[in-house]
Amino acid sequence: MGKLLSLIMKIFFIVLAIFLIYCATIGREFGIKQVHKIMGMYYVHVGDEAYQRNDMQEAVDAYQNGLKLFPEHYEAWLNLGNIYVAYEDYYSAAQAYQNAILAKENYTLARMNLGIITAEKLGDFDAAIAEYQSIIDSKQFLLSIPFVFDNKKSAKDNKAIAYYNMGRAYSQKAFYLPQNKKKEKKELLGQAAVAYGKAHEITKNDYDINYNLALTYHLLGDYRKAGQYYCKAIEASPMHYEAHYNLGLMLKHLNQPKYAIDELEKAAVLSSGKYSTHSKYIFDVLSSVTLEFQQKGEDKSIRDKIKINEPDTQEQPLILVNGKVTATDEAEVAIVENFRKCMSKELFEVN
């Protein structure tokens, strides 16, 4: 069936090209342009087939041939950019995405991909932020026909993703600043928190959004908000160990060993068997907190320890990977629900 369809498409393009060549005698310039367009679309079709077969080199050759003839084909530019990313040719990928945007200004996928590789791979955070802002500011035609078509949700989701990626870009820019640029770092982290907050307004139960909001407030020294969002992240996806671990570290710093032990124990269980180095470090931290707790035999009120919007003077180790354990049977549901409980949540609630 696939071969028959491919043959029909080839015949269609050949017949159409012959017809357009014939028409070129009436309007030569227009006719030549249309011939190039049709032949370009044919090469793009060949590229699409190769792309689906995962034959990337043939796809690249076909797309390049097609785009020489029909450079306005924005989807071909997008696919070509994606292939360059797979080959880790990020500069060529960026150029392909830029060409896609030239062909279609409000092409959200191309802008999003361009922003991601510009920030994550090329280190141009300002350019990435500009792309995300363009997505946020874009005025797209929204249409909702029940049970037929609805692009309102996708447009809303894209804005949430753009805000989230913008937050990451601000955070990364802050991370790469020299240590003596404390004021600038704080300002950038503040901008990251605003961007993550905008994403959270759209998508409240996303683990990554809540976790990065928590982490940003943690770095800013706003422990109350950090605790609130760590708990939200844990409730959204309890089997990721990072939120448990970072919350445990923060509670240790706030002299709340009982709650710190609870979170660090969960982090240790979730990281065991997957990240041996991380697991050992978590167990070491857990052991030290447990020992301190046993020696003191008490924990002080956290409400006297939390300071809002004051940077933390002590550097704290942070693990930033996407490890998780997934429950697979009914017996583990209870375990998941136990991990979902953020025992220190009430400590961060505003009176």
Residue ranges and their predicted role:
Residues 268-351:
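Terminal, low-structured helical/coil segments at or just beyond the last alpha-helical repeat
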Residues 52-65, 86-99, 122-134, 175-198, ...:
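Structural signature of tandem alpha-helical TPR/SEL1-like repeats
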Residues 33, 39-41, 74-75, 108-109, ...:
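Helix-start (N-cap) detector for alpha-helical repeat units in TPR-like alpha-solenoids
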Residues 132-141, 245, 249-276, 284-287, ...:
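TPR/TPR-like (Sel1-like) alpha-helical repeat modules
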Residues 48, 82, 116-117, 168, ...:
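Residue-level recognition of tetratricopeptide repeat
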Residues 44, 51, 78, 85, ...:
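Position-specific recognition of the canonical hydrophobic site in helix A of tetratricopeptide repeat
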Residues 45, 79, 113, 158, ...:
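Canonical tetratricopeptide repeat
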